[in-house]
Amino acid sequence: MLERLNHVAIAVTDLKSAANTYRDILGAKVGEPLDQPEHGVTVVFIELPNTKVELITPLGENSPIFNFFNKNKNGGIHHICYEVKNLELSMNILMKNNYKIIGDNPKIGAHGKPVIFLHPSGFDGTLIELQEE
């Protein structure tokens, strides 16, 4: 089912400062901020040779990231995203094995591809995002 690691998402309190650190101090290729209103976040992608880092910050108080900051005042790792070849097949396998999918249907993610999130309770406390290749 799992293919490659697509990205690791880090919730940050100051998106501009975090992006500057990755670009100016760590020398990484940093993308432009991208609002994702359907997910309630603004994201910046850091391009690395073998994967990406996604810096995320809430768009408002209704954002799931806003709730994350209630528990993690300074931010931190929010989720890990893996690619799958067939998201619908992956969802069926997961549901048949009683894993919880957050939300009813896939949404279009920041890369323009369908994504789902898997509840952390089935993955040792880690929020997992699956993105169709």
Regions found by a protein language model. Name each.
Residues G40-T42:
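Active-site segment of metal-dependent pyrophosphate-handling enzymes
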